[in-house]
């Protein structure tokens, strides 16, 4: 009995905190919810002065309402990093509570690949959609992003690790979520978009530490 209990405890811990190779897989959020999400664990030890985030997602919500794509909160700032879709506008990108917009003239229902980067030294933001760059913009020059973070997929955090609204939740698939603590070059982003090799050092989809809450499923990815 003691051996069985020990096995169950170890299995539970492995599910919550162990590393998983998520290659060719995606998290599926099948319905609107304020309780379903995925929490990602990142080995950050110091504040970020630059970063790049790349991922795939697939949803039918874009012409209906806004939704959160990537939410990185700290105890001082719930929108430390936020990638959000704003209906009738396009992509909203936030660092340290300050927001800029990248308009999308036409919305189609198809898997989308995005990469976005920011650096403190210049404040320059780059935003790439399906391998194509938008015009560079500037945001929060001189700012540093906190390291003690709650990173959530599927919900927007209005407080550290919680206070979700179902009307901002993602309904659909998300995968290939990777993050670096530096700005990737255009050639590197193009390589990632085409499926080439990469070595993320903050979040690595091929060695992902995560915990699922609520109704979220892991399924084969639907994009190439």
Curated annotation (Swiss-Prot):
Record localization: Secreted
Residue list for modification Pyrrolidone carboxylic acid: 19
Sorted UniProt keywords: Acute phase, Calcium, Disulfide bond, Metal-binding, Pyrrolidone carboxylic acid, Secreted, Signal
Entry similarity comment: Belongs to the pentraxin family.
Function: Displays several functions associated with host defense: it promotes agglutination, bacterial capsular swelling, phagocytosis and complement fixation through its calcium-dependent binding to phosphorylcholine. Can interact with DNA and histones and may scavenge nuclear material released from damaged circulating cells.
Inducing factors: The concentration of CRP in plasma increases greatly during acute phase response to tissue injury, infection or other inflammatory stimuli. It is induced by IL1/interleukin-1 and IL6/interleukin-6.
UniProt tissue specificity: Found in plasma.
Gene name of the encoded protein: CRP
Protein name: C-reactive protein
Other remarks in the entry: This protein owes its name to its ability precipitate pneumococcal C-polysaccharide in the presence of calcium.
GO molecular function list: calcium ion binding; choline binding; complement component C1q complex binding; identical protein binding; low-density lipoprotein particle binding; low-density lipoprotein particle receptor binding
Pentraxin (PTX) domain segment(s): 23-224
